[in-house]
Amino acid sequence: MECSFGITGKDYVILASDMGAGRSIVRMKSDENKLKTLGPHLAMAFSGEPGDTNNFAEYIERNMRLYNIRNHFPLLPPAASAWVRRTLAEAIRSRHPYAVNLLLGGFDTTTSKPHLYWIDYLGTKAIVPYAAHGMGVYVSLSTMDKWWYEDMDKKEGVDLLRKCIDETEKRLTIKFDFNCILIDKNGIHKVDLSQADPIANIQEHPQETEVEAPHPPIEVGISA
């Protein structure tokens, strides 16, 4: 049982994913990282079969890195989403499909706009202002629909995420622990939901909360 959320605001994207890993009714890990940084302003939250998710996330990350090395700049969110969708669509038509659902979020530095994409294992892609995968779909989309609006600031986005998490914990029998990141023009930062004001914490400690992300190399063959 997994759960992930994505929320866009005026100039940011928030991605959150649970940290549980298990099979059937058995939980094997409670610190699994299901968020993968793909670039300085691009990340995804993934869920699905354990082996498929790890292999697919690594495959996507390495190919994004290869694009950086070849072209000296990162792949922008619209192009990245198209390539990820095509990869899943081709895989499901092969003998080795990926049972992976994901939320791809990023900030386009050329247009200064946030992007969020809902993608499933069938290769279906939708551009959305907010989204969820897993068990959270059944109880949180109505909360997002009620409280979301286009020009939400970062603090309001975190508050909406907390509403979704609270609703999920209230309606479901399983308690989830969440890993959360925020993507904006300044890069990717970890959101500590245990803090009273996570956004103020990011502003006060930008380096401590920054998530390490691959950057374009200076020269071909030289890593950043």
From Swiss-Prot:
> Is Oxidoreductase among the key words of this record?
no
- Localisation per UniProt entry: Cytoplasm; Nucleus
Q: Which GO terms describe its molecular function?
A: endopeptidase activator activity
Q: Which Pfam families match?
A: Proteasome
CDD domains per UniProt: proteasome_beta_type_2
- Keyword terms of this UniProt record: Cytoplasm, Nucleus, Proteasome
Among the entry's GO cellular component annotations, what is one? cytosol
Query: Is Cytoplasm among the key words of this record?
Result: yes
GO terms of biological process kind: proteasomal ubiquitin-independent protein catabolic process; proteasome-mediated ubiquitin-dependent protein catabolic process
PANTHER family assigned to the protein according to its UniProt record, in alphabetical order? METALLOPROTEASE TLDD, PROTEASOME SUBUNIT BETA TYPE-1
Q: What does this protein do?
A: Non-catalytic component of the proteasome, a multicatalytic proteinase complex which is characterized by its ability to cleave peptides with Arg, Phe, Tyr, Leu, and Glu adjacent to the leaving group at neutral or slightly basic pH. The proteasome has an ATP-dependent proteolytic activity.
Question: What subunit structure does UniProt give?
Answer: The 26S proteasome consists of a 20S proteasome core and two 19S regulatory subunits. The 20S proteasome core is composed of 28 subunits that are arranged in four stacked rings, resulting in a barrel-shaped structure. The two end rings are each formed by seven alpha subunits, and the two central rings are each formed by seven beta subunits. The catalytic chamber with the active sites is on the inside of the barrel.
Q: What family does the Swiss-Prot or TrEMBL record give for this protein?
A: Belongs to the peptidase T1B family.
What protein name does the entry list? Probable proteasome subunit beta type-4
Natural source organism: Cryptococcus neoformans var. neoformans serotype D (strain JEC21 / ATCC MYA-565)
Its gene?
CPR1
